[in-house]
Every structure is written in C-alpha cells, then in structure tokens.
C-alpha cells in the first residue's frame, strides 16, 4: 500500500471518529433524559428485566424457551413452569403478539427435524391457548436444525438445541 493511500485511510478513519458524539445520550445513555420522566416507573427503567411489562422481563426473568427430550414434543414439568409464566405475561400485556419458534438438534434429516420443530412449536402454542392466550396472537414457525444455539457433537450440547423459543413483538394492528 502506498504512503498516500495509508494517509488517506487514516484521515478518513479520523474523520469518521470525529462524527461520533458520546455526550449526546447523557451520562447514562438515556438521550439526556437521565432515565426519568414520562414512561418511567418508580426508578425501574422501561425495557428492563425488572419491569414486569417489558419484553426483557419475559426473556430474562420468566424465560423465553422450553427444552425438549430427544425426538419429543411433550412439554416437561420445567417447561410448564416457564409456559405458565409466559401465559400470565401475555394475558397481562395484550399489546404483544408472539411467534413460537420450534427447533431441533442436528441429528436426523432436515425434513424430520422441520416436522419435529413444528410439533414442538404447536405444543407450546396449544398450551398457551389452553391458558387463555388468544390464538390470533400466536404464530408458529419451525426452523428444524437450521438455527442451532451451538454446533456440537455431545448430548449436553444437543439438548440446548431441542427447544421452542417464544419471540415477542408489539402488536401494530390496533
């Protein structure tokens, strides 16, 4: 690389770095609002895992996934605890919909694992509907073995990939 090219690259990098303004969000990253004001609830930041109306609460406090045994779509007792929490959250936060993703480990054919992921997602959906969540607020999709959490060849690792994940979205229809 020629010296002039190196200098031009350095100048461009410095120019881009100068465009950033870390102070524009205030000391706490809250857009200068200090994390208080409208939408704040007694010191709990909106969107935090401590806010029971936040999607972060369901993801980090209740749990967003249910694990399954090999070749199974039957919900375990541990899974029922998670799904009961999800159902309660969805019943109390009607502004959200959910997509339930079914997943499988890498063992088996692609077609088999897509079908297994669909059965897992449907099992979760049916349970949430049985707890009172409107069916119209739930969608399912199966990824089979196409989106593993980890790529591996041990049972402990495979177990993490046999799951159904509840992904929340704001309901923009109403």
What spans do the regions from the language model cover?
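Bacterial N-terminal signal peptides that target proteins for export
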Residues: 1-8
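C-terminal motif of bacterial Sec signal peptides marking the signal peptidase cleavage site
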Residues: 15-18
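Periplasmic peptidoglycan-binding/tethering modules of Gram-negative envelope proteins
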Residues: 20-97, 171-174
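Extracytoplasmic/secreted proteins, especially bacterial periplasmic and envelope-associated proteins
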Residues: 78-85, 111, 119, 123, ...
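A non-catalytic structural micro-motif
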Residues: 94-103, 118-149, 162-174
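Short beta-alpha junctions and helix-cap segments that line functional grooves
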Residues: 150-154
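A generic structural micro-feature
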Residues: 156-160
């Amino acid at each position: 690389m020629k010296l002039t090219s190196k200098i031009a690259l350095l100048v461009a990098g410095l120019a881009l770095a100068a465009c950033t303004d870390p102070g524009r969000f205030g000391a706490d990253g809250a857009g200068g609002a200090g994390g208080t004001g409208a939408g704040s609830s007694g010191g709990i930041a909106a969107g935090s895992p401590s806010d029971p109306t936040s999607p972060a609460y369901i993801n980090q406090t209740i749990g967003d996934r249910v694990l399954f045994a090999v070749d199974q779509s039957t919900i375990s007792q541990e899974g029922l605890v998670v799904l009961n929490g999800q159902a309660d959250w969805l019943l109390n936060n009607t502004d959200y919909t959910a997509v339930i993703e079914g997943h499988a480990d890498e063992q088996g054919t692609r077609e088999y694992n897509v079908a297994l992921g669909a059965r897992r997602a449907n099992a979760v959906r049916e349970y949430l509907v049985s707890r009172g969540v409107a069916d119209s607020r739930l969608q399912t999709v199966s990824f089979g073995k196409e989106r593993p959490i980890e790529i591996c060849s041990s049972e402990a690792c495979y177990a993490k990939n046999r799951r159904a994940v509840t992904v929340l979205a704001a309901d923009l229809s109403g």
